Amino acid sequence: MLVSPYAILLDGESGSVLASKTGDEKIFPASMVKVMTVLTAIRSISDLDATTTMSADFYDELYAQDASRAGFEPGEEAKLRDLLYGALLPSGAECCMQLAIEAAGSEDAFVELMNQNALDMGLVQTHFTNATGLHSAEK
């Protein structure tokens, strides 16, 4: 029994759709965006053991949106690899933002990389508007 309102089953070899339940409907991806954020960061950052200083620039917005955080604080030193874990395990929005800055210089530039990765993977109906998965009117 399938409980989810959305599902798609693909043939692993051919990529053809075997079954779909509202598979073409646009949905809000929420924290699933973080999977693409981490994938894009891994592809874009050459030294994941390098350290970074958590920028204070985005925290007010994350607090205002009640975003999930991993617990890294502004000004804290963190290894990029730890930010990858922080983005996925506790769904840390601050980790996603810092990875975006480290990988592309800004969230907007990073989102362009995310969208290019999606196209490269054949995800032609997928469009990202931010690195965190927080609600965006653009979907």
Question: Language-model segments: which ranges?
Answer:
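Active-site-adjacent loops and short helices of periplasmic peptidoglycan-processing enzymes
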Residues: 1-139
